[in-house]
């Protein structure tokens, strides 16, 4: 088993990003629109294509009905803020897919999109930062989403721990 972590992911409620260390410098991988982050937004069109990130967000913004799903019941095809329901039994009804989707499935689509920015075919392991307030069910749901996205080895790191670690590494280099 390999201990090296290849990439770090911020799977955010609003936006998400992927980065790795390159020559000792943390480097965020740019999206196809050359942005550091993508919206944590998923849309399913009538052809059942899955749109993620900026494309999905733009569809949502331009949608005349402005049908978006957070916690209300009803059918929609664009989903945002599903991270808030990770680790619960909440499902999202998607009219174009004629099925219910879990927060883990929607999060997996965001993770797959981030994974697509990576040229490394041997991508093996990742660290995903999670909020400090996440409990075991939410952590397990995040792990499930990563597995659904095809990541083989996943570690979770609480956001304050990640910040302290980064500060410690920076401070250590200045001493």
What spans do the regions from the language model cover?
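Conserved phosphate-binding catalytic cores of ATP/NTP-utilizing and phosphoryl-transfer enzymes
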Residues: 1-4, 155-175
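Short beta-strand-initiation
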Residues: 2-4, 13, 33, 37
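Short glycine-aspartate micro-motif
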Residues: 4-11, 127
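A short acidic Gly-Thr/Ser loop motif
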Residues: 9-15, 175
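Short, glycine/acidic-enriched loop or turn micro-motifs at the edges of active sites
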Residues: 13, 132-134, 162
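Classical protein tyrosine phosphatase
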Residues: 17-19
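Phosphate-binding loop and its immediate beta->loop->alpha context
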Residues: 22-158
């Amino acid at each position: 088993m390999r201990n090296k972590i290849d990439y770090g992911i911020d799977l955010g409620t609003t936006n998400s990003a992927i980065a790795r260390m390159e020559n000792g410098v943390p480097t965020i991988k740019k999206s196809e629109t050359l942005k550091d982050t993508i919206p944590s937004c998923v849309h399913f069109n009538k052809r059942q294509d899955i749109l993620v990130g900026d494309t999905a967000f733009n569809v949502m913004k331009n949608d005349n009905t402005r049908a978006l799903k957070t916690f209300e019941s009803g059918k929609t095809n664009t989903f945002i803020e599903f991270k808030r329901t990770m680790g619960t039994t909440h499902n999202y009804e998607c009219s174009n897919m004629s099925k219910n989707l879990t927060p883990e499935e929607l999060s997996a689509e965001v993770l797959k999109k981030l994974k697509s920015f990576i040229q490394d075919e041997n991508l093996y392991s990742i660290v995903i930062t999670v909020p400090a307030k996440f409990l075991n069910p939410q952590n397990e749901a995040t792990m499930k989403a990563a597995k659904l996205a095809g990541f083989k080895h996943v570690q979770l790191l609480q956001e304050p721990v990640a910040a302290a670690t980064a500060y410690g590494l920076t401070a250590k280099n200045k001493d």
